[in-house]
Amino acid sequence: MSRPIRVALVAGEASGDILGSGLMQAIKARHPDAEFIGVGGARMEAEGLKSYFPMERLAVMGLVEVLGRLFELLGRRRQLARDLIAAKPDVFIGIDAPDFNLGLELKLRRAGIKTVHYVSPSVWAWRQKRVLKIREACDLMLTLFPFEAQFYDAHQVPVRFVGHPLADAIPQQADRAAAREALDLPQDGPVVALMPGSRGGEVARLGDLFLDAAIRLRALRPGVRFLLPCATPERRAQLEQMLASRDLPLTLLDGRSHEALAACDAVLIASGTATLEALLYKRPMVVAYRVAPLTYRILKRLVKSPYISLPNLLAERLLVPELIQEAATAEALAQAVAPLIDGGQVQTEGFDVIHRALRRDASVSAADAVLKLAGRD
């Protein structure tokens, strides 16, 4: 009788903890006695992960913070590699966190352990030479999006497109009436969601712009109301300060971004992962982004993709307007959003096709691929 399958996983942040816990559930459905070791958060630990150290020790953002913790991170990776090689798992899964996980995967693969990387870095957009390291470090790449799988196929990296868990979780048809009731909004009349980002720097660059665009939009559509979900108390305080000098029928929400998307008719949104959520809720959108001029010049040279927003990358065409840098003025944003409030059918039809393509029971698909690689399917 064979021993229980032993699976090692490392997640470095909350989104990875969610993906990891779903994957563990799907593996346990096939192998109830599976053993899980590695690094994860509360969700993965609840599924039975024995975590070598708190996941928060890996959750660093920004160059300065990474440099300040570099010796600790490298030391933890060396020790983790030793511990995992000694534990001899059937397979290792690095969940996102590529700067930490790819180096770990390389060491483990050289020691004879099968390695999987779950969630592709943005190699298709920039720093494409990273694919050489990925090819050396990974036995298998699991991607959330089909265009990523096409990129890896072209570079001879074994890959499986598993779909996106959000596409499984968000219904094909969101209930606008129920969402408006939950948010104490009237059932009639246009509602626009403003989503200028979740980080302080994004809100500093886009918050005033989005609020000025809302004022212009109000002149074009006098009855329109606005919702603005705040990711954290800090973002709420930042936005309250911006709102103090403006007279707008706007409701600030603590979190509740999914309810805001379900309740609204259209969205003005910063480029980022929230655009995928807006797409899955089938809400017509205008995407805007501004970065520091020097950053933009550098990115313009490095980025190989023709689009910046996920909806357009997934559609492989200009499905949603993208207003970037100087083009993102309050007037231009208002003019772009206004016709979408009751006329965004071309966008929503495209979103529906994409949602169906991404809905593949991602955790089960990922578990199938992992177990097949480990020879325990």
From Swiss-Prot:
Protein's GO biological process: lipid A biosynthetic process
One annotated GO molecular function: lipid-A-disaccharide synthase activity
Record Gene3D superfamilies: Glycogen Phosphorylase B
Catalytic activity, as annotated: a lipid X + a UDP-2-N,3-O-bis[(3R)-3-hydroxyacyl]-alpha-D-glucosamine = a lipid A disaccharide + UDP + H(+)
Pathway field: Bacterial outer membrane biogenesis; LPS lipid A biosynthesis
Family: Belongs to the LpxB family.
Gene: lpxB
Function: Condensation of UDP-2,3-diacylglucosamine and 2,3-diacylglucosamine-1-phosphate to form lipid A disaccharide, a precursor of lipid A, a phosphorylated glycolipid that anchors the lipopolysaccharide to the outer membrane of the cell.
Protein name as it appears in the record: Lipid-A-disaccharide synthase
This protein's GO CC annotations: membrane
Class of enzymatic activity (EC top level): transferase
Keyword presence, Transferase: yes
Keyword vocabulary terms for this entry: Glycosyltransferase, Lipid A biosynthesis, Lipid biosynthesis, Lipid metabolism, Transferase
Coiled coil: none
Enzyme Commission code: 2.4.1.182
